[in-house]
Amino acid sequence: MWLEPREPRDQVGIVASPLPRPNYDDCAVGAQYRTAPNVPYELTFNKLSLRAGWDRDDEYLLLDGFGRGNHMHFDANAILRYARGGLPLLCDGEYIKNSPKYHSSMVIIRDGQAELTPAVTRLDRAEMLTSAGCTQTTLTQYNGADWTRTMLWRPNAYLLVADEVKALTTGDYALRCCWRPWGEASVRDNSLLLSSPPMRLAVCNVTGEPARLENLKQSGNMP
């Protein structure tokens, strides 16, 4: 019997996949970087995807909600992948190095010190309307602060990412919003410009803070 191929339309738009309960429970007892979840299980998620469609030119984004596990990275609330035209434009920066700076993520330093990121991310909002969508996710109690990442998305047109950090503890805070491009990157007028022919990507900083480009060491032919 032959079946006609059909696109999985239920994966188009905004989709949040649930975090398996054993993964949640293992955070506090696992062998590596034990951290008790600080968000109720019902508010967690595993992955959050934004998919415009199944054509090659359609854009796709994947955000991580889980920052532990066996082969783990501290990438909760980080954008793992952004692709358009069938090509990756934002990606993980390292296979081995797992700290937030190697991801499209937020680094929070308080009084000159860093802490391990929380294990799970809270899903506050994930809504798809007729022509646009909105998501809101929060990493709670991250080195004395809550970090909320809001994304406003018009499929195949633009993506607005707003990061808000709310201090819960008094201290001297330093914030680094990191982006990990795939391709030839440059900085102009506080914007990250990426060329990965035939695609181009502009990550524009609308708040005016200065930007800089750092070249990290190569590992396994990763840029």
Predicted regions and their residues:
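Short, intrinsically disordered, charge-balanced linker/junction segments flanking boundaries
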Residues: 218-223
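Catalytic and substrate-binding regions of extracellular carbohydrate-active enzymes
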Residues: 3-215
